[in-house]
């Protein structure tokens, strides 16, 4: 079963931790999009991010994915570099410097 919780970086955003028991609709979209996705914008009352917990990621990698997806929501942008910059700032402000370095080093910005 998926865990649904508030994002550790913004309590106005729901976070779904996707596992093998998660709805196939969500898993299919994750398989197309990568390790996470964000649902936000016009008509979405509460933004939702989904983080793929099936991949055996480290805690820092999971934090990096969550922060990147929160970056999409907070910036209101689907642009990857914009979300990446916001994610790095979010992680640094929260003291997660190793996770921020993961985003810095992956080549999006």
Question: What does each model-found stretch correspond to?
Answer:
Residues 78-109:
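Post-HExxH zinc-binding segment in Zn-dependent metallohydrolases
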Residues 4-5, 68, 82, 90:
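Structured N-terminal alpha/beta-domain signature
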Residues 17-59, 70-73:
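Active-site scaffold of zinc-dependent metalloenzymes
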Residues 64-76, 84:
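Active-site recognition of the HExxH zinc-binding catalytic motif
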């Amino acid at each position: 079963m998926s865990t649904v919780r508030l994002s550790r970086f913004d309590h106005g955003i729901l976070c779904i931790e996707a596992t093998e028991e998660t709805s196939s609709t969500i898993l299919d979209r994750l398989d197309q999009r990568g390790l996470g996705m964000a649902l936000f914008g016009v008509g979405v009352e509460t933004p939702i991010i989904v983080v793929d917990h099936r991949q055996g990621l480290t805690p820092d990698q999971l934090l990096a994915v969550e922060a990147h997806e929160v970056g999409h929501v907070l910036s209101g942008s689907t642009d990857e570099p914009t979300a990446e910059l916001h994610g790095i700032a979010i992680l640094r402000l929260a003291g997660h410097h190793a996770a921020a370095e993961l985003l810095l080093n992956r080549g999006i910005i």
